[in-house]
Amino acid sequence: MSLLIEQARYHLSAHNARQLPDDGGYEVAFAGRSNAGKSSALNALTRQNSLARVSKTPGRTQQLVFFQIQPERYLVDLPGYGYAKVPQDLQAHWQAFIDRYFRTREALRGLVVVMDIRHPLKDYDLQMLGYAAERGLPAHGLLTKADKLGRGQQMQTLQKVKKEVSSRFGDSVTVQTYSGESRQGVDELRGIVGGWLGLDVEPPADA
């Protein structure tokens, strides 16, 4: 399964609904606030150093970026939340686009919300988890940069976040700690994402 995920390649970028791929198959979306480590997590997941561009400019991702693993198997990089330098009309466009994507996209099978373990469950994170809950989709909270905290602090934050998401969203959200520096949690993330994409079993020959 991990070898399949490593086959991910850039497919297309969508600025509006007309540019999205056909709505079939399996997609897993990744969302995260600026500098939460979303691009780095995608690169670690696929064992590629530059699949998702890592930018020092907050909110640089201004489109839905699709990475194809196999036909009808995609990882989707959602726009980073960092719109301070973006005009209000463009902010409104992205809000409407993402809202429509979550409400109508049949191929969407799960959502990974990437959060800095030192600053979890901000308003944007809860909004994204809420989108998944409204659709009845599973979500996974990825607490990144775990190496910045001691083991005890990691576990304390993990339990606190688990308790909070459980009270808000029930058992539809799972949570883990993760570090790109030490590769802590990469295999766990692969298992979650691979399961949602149907990569834990052989896909149909005509997929």
Swiss-Prot record:
Coiled coil: none annotated. One of its GO terms (biological process) is division septum assembly. GO terms for molecular function: GTP binding; metal ion binding. It comes from the Bacteria. GO terms for cellular component: cytosol. Mg(2+) binds at residues 39, 61. Keywords: Cell cycle, Cell division, GTP-binding, Magnesium, Metal-binding, Nucleotide-binding, Septation. GTP binds at residues 32-39, 59-63, 77-80, 144-147, 178-180. SUPFAM superfamilies: P-loop containing nucleoside triphosphate hydrolases. Residues 24-199 form the EngB-type G domain. PROSITE patterns: G_ENGB. The keyword Cell cycle applies. Its cofactor is Mg(2+). Belongs to the TRAFAC class TrmE-Era-EngA-EngB-Septin-like GTPase superfamily. EngB GTPase family. PANTHER family: ENGB-TYPE G DOMAIN-CONTAINING PROTEIN, MSS1/TRME-RELATED GTP-BINDING PROTEIN. NCBIfam families: GTPase_YsxC. Necessary for normal cell division and for the maintenance of normal septation. This is Probable GTP-binding protein EngB. The gene is engB.
